[in-house]
Amino acid sequence: NLVTLIKDNINLIKELDTTIIINFNSNKLEIILNSDGEQLSRVFFNLIKNSIESIQDKKLDNINFKGIIDITLNDSTSDMNFVIVDNGLGFGAFTGNLKDILNPYFTTKKKGTGLGLAIVNKIINDHNGTIDFIPIEDGAKINIIFIK
């Protein structure tokens, strides 16, 4: 059940920064995808963690900044859609390199390995899915679609 999987990841990772508000909405109480739950858990954990880190970096310039992460999971007859939107730094650091964001060893983090999103992309592809990084005005949006 992906709803439970995402909620479990939110509960685990929100301890990294309890000041960030994480909202989760789903159009169903139970969404089943024929998948490797452990691998998908890694995807959701990594993406939520990246959002938290982006918000924390933005807070360095504004101590009163209120971080928000909105996560949506919707199921339809043909696909399952996972969307995460945050009001962190966004993809500004990747301007001109957005296509490289999924390449192994590509990173803008001081202590990053550049493997996180490459692994996320492989797991999503292995599950018949696609991932898109969408720059928005005040943050970042990531859209994942799994075809059933």
Question: Which residues fall in each region the model found?
Answer:
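A conserved beta-strand-to-alpha-helix junction within the catalytic ATP-binding
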Residues: 1-10
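Conserved catalytic submotifs in the C-terminal HATPase_c
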Residues: 19-31
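Conserved micro-motifs of the catalytic ATP-binding
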Residues: 32-35, 108
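ATP-lid-like helix-loop hinge signature
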Residues: 52-77
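Short conserved segment of the HATPase_c
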Residues: 91-104
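Short alpha-helical Gxxx[C/S/T] motif in the catalytic ATP-binding
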Residues: 116, 120
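Detector for a conserved hydrophobic position within an alpha-helical segment of the HATPase_c
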Residues: 124-125
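Conserved glycine-rich
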Residues: 129-130
